[in-house]
């Protein structure tokens, strides 16, 4: 059955003179992804693209998706689970384009039926692209599709490390009994899945000393387990010493192994994590700056203007706390943001849109929690799947379900709008 529980996906889009709404279908079977090919005479021609097309006035995005895929390729996806990945907003001056992106996994029977089809019903070439080649830019895509590739790197399941406090009481016979940090390292070195995604956090009280301590412990784990795709607290991004990490990594490999020097581009850090508190602190500052612009900024104010640019460009060029929009900062790594309510999701959407406008690394996803009751936060009232799904529909980026879940609940989570499920205990399988 199609995933029609998404309240936004099932609402017809109102007519707009400026906004062109487009439904985009990321169709795949396991690691094979369907791409069309834009003809040379088309805008951004001679490039591959995900199939889809314009959403008609008063048509729902999901209905448009099913119709466009059928008209372009002949594929019938009406019975498949249709997962919202996100929405991308582009301003071209004379018009605005909103891409509504959905992910659809074909059954084995559908794939066998469709895989030999070399051309669509509009005579466009069709190609099945291997995911690894697709993510490594083997297939040139329009610039607007680059964020989609970052989203596709997300796994089905994601591990979260235990807080350091969990290791303050040693197990019987533990030789590292006096050092919780070493026990934390030993446990996660052994238990984090090989080449898996892992959110590395120790949950220490924030202080300068603890920032350095947390960065040092995480650096040691990254040196030992450089295979993982790590998510690291955003506040540690300047505390991690790349040279020290490189030295530690070399200490853990044979002298004959040729390892590149580590830097921002080849670190095993796939994303930085923002807490909801950090997000809302940024958003409050953003709103103050926006109000300042609305009231008429003085030319001597500390704002970066281009006199030929419109207000939106001036808006996103302001300097904010956390440097989240600073084009000269190290913003080449994407973000994952924790959200717990509609207000924080709206703030995350705003940040995602501004970073897209500035061509910064995208907001890859949000953590939305808690879905169910948890042992770690028994005081928090769980959302339940119905409320969780309604909130997930508001997000312009993929949503990671968190709170009381296990990997076995992945399919249920997908039906409710989750791209990924995450947790602590049951998500750490060992190497």
What are the functions of these language-model segments?
Residues 277-280, 367-378, 412-431:
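Glycine-rich phosphate-binding active-site loops on the catalytic face of alpha/beta enzymes
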Residues 341, 384-387, 397-409, 413, ...:
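Glycine-rich adenosine-cofactor-binding loop
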């Amino acid at each position: 059955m199609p995933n029609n529980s998404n309240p936004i996906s099932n609402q017809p889009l109102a007519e707009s003179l400026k906004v062109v709404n487009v439904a985009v279908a990321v169709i795949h079977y396991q690691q094979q992804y369907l791409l069309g090919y834009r003809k040379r005479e088309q805008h951004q021609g001679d490039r591959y693209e995900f199939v889809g097309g314009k959403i008609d006035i008063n048509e729902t995005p999901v209905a448009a998706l099913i119709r466009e895929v059928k008209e372009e390729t002949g594929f019938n996806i009406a019975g498949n689970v249709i997962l919202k990945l996100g929405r991308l907003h582009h301003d071209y001056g004379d018009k605005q384009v909103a891409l509504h992106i959905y992910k659809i996994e074909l059954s084995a029977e559908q794939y066998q039926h469709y895989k030999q089809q070399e051309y669509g019903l509009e005579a466009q070439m069709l190609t099945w692209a291997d995911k690894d080649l697709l993510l490594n830019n083997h297939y040139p895509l329009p610039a607007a599709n680059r964020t989609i590739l970052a989203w596709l790197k997300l796994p089905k399941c994601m591990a979260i490390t235990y807080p350091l406090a969990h290791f303050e009481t040693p197990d019987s016979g533990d030789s590292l009994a006096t050092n919780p940090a070493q026990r934390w390292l030993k446990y996660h070195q052994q238990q984090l899945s090989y080449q898996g995604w892992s959110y590395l956090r120790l949950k220490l009280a924030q202080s300068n000393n603890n920032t350095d301590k947390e960065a040092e412990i995480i650096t040691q784990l990254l040196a030992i387990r450089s295979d993982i795709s790590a998510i690291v607290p955003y506040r540690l991004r300047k505390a991690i010493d790349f040279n020290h990490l490189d030295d530690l990594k070399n200490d853990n490999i044979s002298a004959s192994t040729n390892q590149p020097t580590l830097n921002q581009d080849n670190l095993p850090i796939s994303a930085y994590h923002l807490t909801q508190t950090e997000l809302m602190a940024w958003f409050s500052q953003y709103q103050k700056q926006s109000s300042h612009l609305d009231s008429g900024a003085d030319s001597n104010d500390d704002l970066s203007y281009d006199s030929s640019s419109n207000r939106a460009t001036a808006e996103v060029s302001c300097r904010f706390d956390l440097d989240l929009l600073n084009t000269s900062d190290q913003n080449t790594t994407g973000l994952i943001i924790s959200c717990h309510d509609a207000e924080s999701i709206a703030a995350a959407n705003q940040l995602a849109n501004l970073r897209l406008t500035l061509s910064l690394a995208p907001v890859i996803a949000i953590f939305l929690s808690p879905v169910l009751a948890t042992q770690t936060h028994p005081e928090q009232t769980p959302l339940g799947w119905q409320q969780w799904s309604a909130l997930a529909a508001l997000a312009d980026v993929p949503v990671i379900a968190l709170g009381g879940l296990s990997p076995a609940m992945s399919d249920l989570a997908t039906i409710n709008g989750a791209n990924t499920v995450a947790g602590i205990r049951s998500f750490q399988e060992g190497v």
